[in-house]
Each structure stands twice: as C-alpha cells, then as structure tokens.
C-alpha cells in the first residue's frame, strides 16, 4: 500500500514538473503580417505582437525566402526619423514585443521569390531564456 501511494505521488510530481517545464516557453503571436512590397522592391516590413509567460530575448528570425531578417526600431530624433537595428530585444510576462508600423518592426531583406497577397509565410524565431536555453518557434505571417 505504501509503495502504491509512493508511485501515485511520484506520478503527480512528474505531471506537475512537466507542466511547469512545458509551460515555461509558452509564446503567443497575434496580428502577424508582412507588408506586400511595391513591384521591383526586394525589401519589406513585418509586424506582430508577441507575448510570453517568461522572460525571453529574440536572437534570430529567418525564412528561406529572405536573405536576411532583422528587428529594427524607429524613433524621431531632432525632427528626423531614425531606424536602428535592435540587438536581442527582450519580452516578458508584462512586456510583449510589439512590432508595428512606425515603431519596432521586422525588416525583411532580399526577397527571393515574389510575395503574393494573402499568402502565408512561416517565420522561424529563435529565443533564449534567462538560463540560456534556446527556444525555436515558427509563426505564420500573412502577406497583405
């Protein structure tokens, strides 16, 4: 009987630990879209809101249809709009990463195949947590 109770407790403990570990990298995305570039232009921008329940840094974003994808910020400095590359932007439980027109955004360089309105593209995001664990997630972005 004691052995049976011990097995039940071990099983419950395992379930609790699993839910903590698997819930730690919960990452949600909304409003994910890529702007359809004008004809002849091989660069465009992407936008989304990314939320998580833990502290993370964005290390990389990629897709085979683009030579390079970077995260950029935009801000007005002395009346001039400046765009700068963001290095390892952070997000957390109370601080989502908001990528929006005229603000932080994705810059997608070197379009290899023409984008079509309404098409879905999978962008691969690589995150790192506070313990340096790598988390790789694919998110769907619609071209519009």
Language model features by range: what are they?
Residues 18-20:
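N-terminal signal peptide c-region/cleavage motif recognized by signal peptidases
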Residues 2-10:
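Bacterial N-terminal signal peptides that target proteins for export
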Residues 23:
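Pyridoxal 5′-phosphate
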């Amino acid at each position: 009987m004691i052995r049976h109770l011990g097995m039940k407790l071990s099983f419950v403990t395992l379930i609790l630990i699993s839910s903590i570990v698997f819930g730690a990298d919960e990452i949600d995305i909304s409003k994910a879209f890529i702007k359809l570039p004008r004809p002849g232009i091989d660069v465009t921008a992407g936008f989304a809101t990314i939320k998580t329940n833990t502290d993370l840094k964005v290390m990389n974003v990629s897709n085979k249809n683009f030579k390079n994808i970077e995260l950029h910020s935009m801000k007005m400095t002395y009346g001039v709009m400046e765009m700068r590359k963001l290095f390892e932007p952070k997000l957390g439980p109370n601080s989502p990463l908001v990528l929006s027109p005229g603000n932080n955004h994705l810059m997608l360089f070197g379009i290899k195949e023409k984008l079509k309105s309404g098409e879905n593209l999978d962008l691969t995001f690589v995150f790192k947590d506070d313990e340096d664990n790598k988390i790789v997630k694919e998110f769907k972005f619609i071209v519009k």
